[in-house]
């Protein structure tokens, strides 16, 4: 947390500024000898200045660290630098000293660092000639430091710089010894290794041992050299975009390193084999490795005196100061060293660990190094400064300075991140660094952050969102925190992440909504980067900033974007077009922030890690609020957030408000955050779809393709459940992340946060796509990946359970009850998109085949999909989903009939593919644009929603089969409108909690104002349903209306609300019950899932529209939006698959709504399900009228539904299931394990109607029909109250699938 403070101090810090203000002002004279000229770097530990040595009149590097910082790294730097004097490749030490205010080291000034030089190359790579010759020099420097008994432990490109003088410009110097450690004892023997050592170094280049927190040895420095050289030659590493230490460690451990050699000289196999054979005690054969370089050069005829690549370019790279070097300080220790905010390095005080053992005699005392003071020159500036005696140590000043610079840059953020990173490395819940909210988001400067453990990246996202509420700087720093969603997505312990829960106030800030949305994006793209405050990231900010501008900035004010100028030491690993990155980021960022951090974290750093971390627990995180965040049994290790969160903001689901998403829904106390998280999930699918459409956007064409295609494919196929559960948190930042990655890697300690970003970047990275393609595939976008993950989950279970399976298993059980599904959970949340719904109608078919859509809905549980900025989110995702859904409507008939039809990988894929290709792509583009627009306006918040809502919207629009009808127009004329539609649907699903509450809410929502209202409250209600806080949702919704203008289509809020409120009451219980019951329900859930998957999907479509507008439509039982969806979901739920198919076949045909009105009325009382998110108010009012009649028209509704959707009986049956759901929400509540999910499911079912409702003409009637159908069940619902509860409990257990299945059981 203190780490965060560092970033908070000054956003400029990110750019390399000081932790706070620069420690030294310009023209300040240190020790009467060194006059500060300018700051050239800054890190977590301190700052690096270019200074003029008044004695020698030469420019030197001055590294300064505050004397107040807990981590004092300069001591180690001085100790090692002094020991290395006289060695080649080591800066000349000039002096050191300290005073009351700061410690400093003066050394020779060097030129540009290698990370900067590589990034400056056209392709981001060095030729083999340059790579091999640099390799030789770096190897010599490594051998030199080892020869004096020290390990560098942070070997990376930014810690090596070329000389800047004519005599040294071709020599490579080793910098930054702050992380060094003495591996020998006083007798020169190798010290015994510690059992557990804190992680040191930079994630990207760290050895597997370092990732495992094992004692690092000499071979670990060589592993880092190996990774460096591969990166030099290839331009990137497979894990380049992944910032999460745990994930990268898992990838490295499993990765076939020989794959890295395909572009390297054949001799490198000897290098790899040798270092792989070494252990801690074994001395490396430096000569063997040197011979590898030399032989490779001979083979290629490379001369030692050839020009280096940057020399050929005619650049004066070498002559520029080592400012770029600062990124080196991104290493973890540097962060710790910076000591900003009492950050302690990862397990074990790095500084202490390094210096206490070895440097007992080392002091920065002026006397020790006192150089001749210029006579007559009184010490200027430093009050105590006078006694800073420059140490005319001599030749090493440069190294010190450079390291200092790097560290300083890094340390700025590092201060805050190190502790978090440490926690993360320890596997302890790491406070998710909140996404730094865009400046526009009004956040209290520094809200007391409640760090709660977040099980999933999404939860982190929520936390990020919450953080976003905190000041931008804070947000940034938090984002930087390893706990940040992106981090979480990457981290192997997503569930354990701590989510920062800034107070309710943060969440409530209405302005936050847009800010949150943007923040989320920023968090997604920047959050991981916020660590960028660290040197590397800071410098890299130029690159990732560009991306940020595209994705994040457009979403939120320029100020929001952290100007992390960590030295772009290594972050801009890939020189990919920034715009693509930006767009990708947009897509990804918008998705999770987790995606910043997360929505499903989305931010998943790597597919691999995700698979590794398929722990459902993370998904549950999102419900930190009082939902059963911990509901997810899979994340028992991490503290259940539910309790924690419930206190601070019971309604806010950690998952829902992942990071920025929560922020987005600031207005809705908890839901705003939810909205953000939702946005994350939505973005994910959207990104994937979009990626399908535009591979160019994906940095890693392969990976992206895998993700995009994989996403839909996964959604359809759902082969990897575990992956899906993995956190999608880091997804958002892939594009940016490349650069960021490099920087972040350099800021290891703080970088862990960045690691997530890097992970995200990696996801986009082609390398990742190739090497980690499968693993990363699901994580193509941070959000996307998360969604995919969820989708995968749902895909895996697709045939049987869209998301239910994975959700159920991974976190479905616990999470289902929790509405707080994270983006990852989103897939689990797919439950919200009732499979039954998907099955029911064409929409159902669409949904089923569109696991993505389902995933979106699932990913962003309705609560998660709070549609505060639903329309924004929806816009982006909805198009994608809706197009998919639209395309899929036909399959839905069969799918619904089959129950798995849509879900079936083959069928689903086919359906999805077609939609993706045409409607989906079209919609995706439209949605993307609107999504981006929305995102820019309130996009971040909507992004999470987008994920979930997008899916729903897709359902909504697609189910109608006329995306253009409602969905396309909405995105076109009003990105928000489309999003709103989608969002509303989703929200209505999520929001339809308590029947009583819903009606009023629905009424409000139904009003012209309704869409916005629905949107606003939707997040809350969505969250509520999950949390079983229907009541809360209602208020939230009302509060949110202003912030949630995006959905114009009235949503069936009542549906969701009804489920939600009862859910709300039982949220905790259900959560826990769910956890207890997850396995029990698994079998049933599987069956129900299969049957209900379509329902769920349909429901998700409807749900999305319901969510936002459900409240208003709830009353009105929007016949419009949910007509198709509702009928589809209703029939699916109630009817056998055949019936569903029949219903689906007819579901597209609009039916008269007049008869339904009475039913709606009844329905509202019985169970307001926000039947539809009617595109127009007219429909809404119509629905409202119907709603009052609710139950009475139940029969009518059934026949209509039968006619439109399929057999009357099927409709009636569906209605029944739907009705049971509404009561079921409460029932669901009773059934703790599945209450939330069931709520979601219920809402989703009802959402189905909203989905259709979104469809203009047909949907209304259908929605009405469905709604009526539900009202029919409404009486039953009341009757089913108990039974419904049971069913709902089951559904909750099935996580929405259960809902669908329950509906089916009811029907059956």
Swiss-Prot record:
The keyword Protein biosynthesis does not apply. The modification Phosphoserine is found at residues 441, 541. Residues 541-555, 574-589, 786-795 have a biased composition (Basic and acidic residues). Residues 34-297 form the Protein kinase domain. The keyword Cytoplasm applies. Residues 638-647, 1097-1107 have a biased composition (Low complexity). Residues 485-496, 868-885, 1020-1035 have a biased composition (Polar residues). Divalent metal cations. Mg(2+) or, to a lesser extent, Mn(2+), but not Ca(2+) or Zn(2+). ATP binds at residues 40-48, 63. Its main location: cytoplasm. Pfam families: Pkinase. It catalyses: L-seryl-[protein] + ATP = O-phospho-L-seryl-[protein] + ADP + H(+); L-threonyl-[protein] + ATP = O-phospho-L-threonyl-[protein] + ADP + H(+). It is found in: Cytoplasm. GO terms for cellular component: cytosol; microtubule associated complex; neuronal cell body; nucleoplasm; perinuclear region of cytoplasm. The active site is at residue 154. Residues 735-769 have a biased composition (Acidic residues). Disulfide bonds: none annotated. Belongs to the protein kinase superfamily. CK1 Ser/Thr protein kinase family. This is Tau-tubulin kinase 1. It comes from Mus musculus. The gene is Ttbk1.
């Amino acid at each position: 947390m203190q780490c965060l403070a560092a970033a908070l101090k000054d956003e400029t810090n990110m750019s390399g500024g000081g932790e706070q203000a620069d420690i030294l002002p310009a023209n300040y004279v240190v020790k009467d000898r060194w006059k500060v000229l300018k700051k050239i770097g800054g890190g977590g530990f301190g700052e690096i200045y270019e200074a003029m040595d008044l004695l020698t009149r030469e420019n030197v590097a001055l590294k300064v660290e505050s004397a107040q910082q807990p981590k004092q790294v300069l001591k180690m730097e001085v100790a090692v630098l002094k020991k290395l004097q006289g060695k080649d490749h080591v800066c000349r030490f000039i002096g050191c000293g300290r005073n009351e205010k700061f410690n400093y080291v003066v050394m020779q000034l060097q030129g540009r660092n290698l990370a900067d030089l590589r990034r400056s190359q056209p392709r981001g790579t060095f030729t083999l000639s340059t790579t091999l010759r640099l390799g030789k020099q770096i190897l010599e420097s490594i051998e030199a430091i080892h020869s004096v008994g020290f390990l560098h432990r942070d070997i990376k490109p930014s810690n090596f710089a070329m000389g800047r003088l004519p005599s040294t410009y071709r020599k490579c110097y080793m910098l930054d010894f702050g992380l060094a450690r003495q591996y020998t004892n006083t007798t020169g023997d190798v010290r015994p290794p510690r059992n557990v050592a804190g992680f040191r170094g930079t994630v990207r280049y760290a050895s597997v041992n370092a990732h495992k927190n094992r004692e690092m040895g000499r071979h670990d420095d060589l592993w880092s050299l190996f990774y460096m050289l591969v990166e030099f030659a290839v331009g990137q590493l497979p894990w380049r975009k992944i910032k999460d230490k745990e994930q990268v460690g898992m990838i490295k451990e499993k990765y076939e390193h020989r794959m890295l050699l395909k572009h390297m000289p054949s001799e490198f196999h000897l290098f790899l084999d040798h270092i792989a054979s070494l252990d801690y005690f074994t001395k490396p054969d430096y000569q063997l490795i040197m011979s590898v370089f030399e032989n490779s050069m001979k083979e290629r005829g490379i001369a030692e005196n050839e020009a280096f690549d940057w020399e050929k370019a005619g650049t004066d790279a070498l002559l520029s100061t080592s400012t770029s070097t600062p990124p080196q300080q991104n290493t973890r220790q540097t962060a710790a060293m910076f000591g900003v905010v009492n950050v302690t390095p990862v397990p074990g005080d790095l500084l202490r660990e390094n210096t206490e053992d070895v440097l007992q005699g080392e002091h920065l005392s002026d006397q020790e190094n006192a150089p001749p003071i210029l006579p007559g020159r009184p010490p200027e500036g430093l009050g105590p400064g006078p006694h800073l005696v420059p140490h005319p140590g001599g030749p090493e000043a440069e190294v010190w300075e450079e390291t200092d610079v790097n560290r300083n840059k890094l340390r700025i953020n590092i201060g805050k991140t190190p502790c978090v990173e440490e926690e993360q490395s320890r596997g302890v819940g790491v406070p998710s660094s909140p996404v730094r909210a865009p400046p526009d988001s009004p956040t209290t400067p520094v809200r007391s952050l409640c760090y709660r453990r977040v099980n999933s990246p999404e939860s982190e996202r929520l936390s990020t969102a919450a953080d976003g509420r905190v000041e931008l700087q804070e947000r940034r720093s938090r984002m930087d925190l390893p706990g940040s969603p992106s981090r979480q997505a990457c981290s192997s312990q997503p569930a354990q992440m701590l989510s920062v829960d800034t107070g309710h106030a943060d969440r409530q800030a209405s302005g936050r909504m847009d800010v949150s949305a943007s923040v989320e994006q920023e968090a997604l793209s920047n959050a991981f980067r916020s660590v960028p405050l660290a040197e590397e990231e800071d410098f890299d900010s130029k690159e990732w900033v560009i991306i940020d501008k595209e994705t994040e900035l457009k979403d939120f004010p320029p100020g929001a974007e952290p100007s992390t100028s960590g030295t772009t030491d290594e972050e801009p690993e890939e020189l990919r077009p920034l715009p693509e990155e930006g767009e990708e980021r947009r897509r990804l960022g918008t998705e999770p922030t987790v995606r910043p951090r997360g929505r499903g974290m989305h931010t998943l750093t790597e597919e691999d890690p995700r698979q590794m971390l398929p722990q459902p627990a993370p998904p549950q995180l999102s419900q930190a609020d009082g939902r059963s965040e911990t509901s997810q049994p899979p994340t028992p290790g991490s503290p259940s957030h539910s309790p924690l969160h419930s206190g601070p903001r019971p309604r806010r689901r950690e998952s829902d408000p992942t990071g920025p998403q929560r922020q987005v829904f600031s207005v809705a106390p908890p839901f705003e955050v939810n909205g953000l998280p939702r946005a994350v999930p939505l973005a994910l699918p959207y990104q994937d779809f979009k990626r399908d459409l535009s591979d160019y956007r994906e940095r890693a064409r392969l990976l992206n393709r895998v993700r995009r295609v994989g996403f839909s494919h996964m959604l359809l196929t759902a082969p990897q459940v575990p992956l899906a559960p993995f956190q999608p948190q880091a997804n958002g930042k892939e594009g940016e992340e490349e650069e960021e990655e490099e920087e972040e890697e350099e800021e290891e300690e703080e970088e862990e946060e960045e690691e997530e970003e890097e992970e995200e970047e990696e996801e986009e990275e082609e390398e990742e796509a190739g090497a980690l393609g499968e693993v990363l595939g699901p994580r193509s976008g941070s959000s996307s990946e998360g969604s995919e993950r969820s989708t995968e989950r749902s895909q895996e279970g697709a045939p049987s359970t869209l998301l239910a399976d994975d959700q159920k298993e991974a976190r479905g059980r616990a999470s289902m009850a929790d509405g707080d599904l994270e983006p990852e959970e989103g897939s689990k949340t797919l439950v919200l998109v009732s499979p039954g719904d998907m099955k029911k109608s064409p929409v159902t078919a669409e949904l089923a085949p569109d696991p993505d859509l389902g995933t979106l809905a699932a990913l962003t549980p309705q609560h998660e999909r709070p549609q505060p900025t639903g329309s924004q989110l929806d816009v982006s995702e909805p198009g994608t989903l809706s197009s998919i859904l639209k395309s899929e409507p036909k399959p839905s008939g069969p799918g619904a009939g089959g129950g798995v039809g849509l879900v079936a990988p083959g069928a689903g894929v086919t359906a999805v593919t077609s939609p993706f290709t045409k409607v989906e792509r079209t919609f995706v583009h439209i949605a993307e644009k609107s999504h981006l627009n929305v995102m820019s306006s309130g996009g971040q918040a909507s992004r999470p929603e987008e994920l979930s809502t997008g899916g729903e919207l897709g359902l909504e629009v697609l189910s109608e089969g006329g995306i253009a009808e409602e969905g396309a127009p909405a995105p076109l004329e009003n990105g928000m409108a489309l999003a709103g539609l989608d969002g509303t649907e989703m929200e209505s699903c999520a929001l339809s909690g308590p029947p009583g509450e819903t009606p009023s809410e629905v009424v409000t929502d139904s009003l012209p104002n309704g869409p916005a209202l629905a949107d606003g409250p939707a997040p809350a209600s969505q969250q509520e349903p999950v949390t079983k806080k229907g009541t809360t949702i209602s208020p939230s919704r009302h509060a949110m209306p202003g912030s949630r203008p995006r959905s114009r289509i009235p949503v069936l809020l009542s549906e969701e609300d009804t489920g939600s409120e009862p859910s709300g009451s039982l949220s905790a219980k259900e959560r826990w019950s769910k956890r207890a019951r997850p396995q029990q329900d698994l079998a049933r859930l599987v069956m129900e899932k299969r049957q209900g998957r379509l329902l769920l999907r349909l429901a998700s479509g409807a749900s999305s529209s319901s969510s936002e507008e459900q409240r208003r439509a709830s009353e009105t039982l929007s016949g419009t939006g949910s007509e198709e969806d509702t009928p589809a979901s209703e029939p699916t739920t109630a009817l056998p698959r055949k019936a569903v198919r029949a219903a689906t076949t007819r579901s597209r045909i609009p039916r008269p709504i007049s008869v339904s009105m009475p039913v709606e009325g009844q329905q509202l009382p019985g169970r307001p399900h926000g039947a539809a998110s009617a595109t127009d108010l007219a429909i809404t009012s119509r629905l409202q009228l119907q709603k009052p009649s609710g139950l009475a028209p139940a029969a009518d509704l059934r026949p209509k539904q039968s006619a439109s959707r399929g057999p009357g009986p099927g409709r009636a049956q569906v209605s029944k299931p739907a009705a049971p759901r509404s009561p079921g929400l409460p029932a669901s509540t009773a059934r703790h394990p599945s209450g939330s999910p069931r709520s979601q499911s219920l809402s989703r079912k009802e959402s189905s109607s909203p989905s259709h409702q979104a469809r203009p003409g047909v949907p209304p009637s259908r929605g009405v029909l469905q709604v009526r159908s539900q009202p029919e069940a409404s009486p039953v619902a009341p009757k089913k109250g108990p039974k419904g509860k049971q069913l709902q409990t089951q559904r909750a257990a099935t996580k929405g699938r259960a809902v669908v299945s329950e509906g089916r059981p009811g029907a059956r």
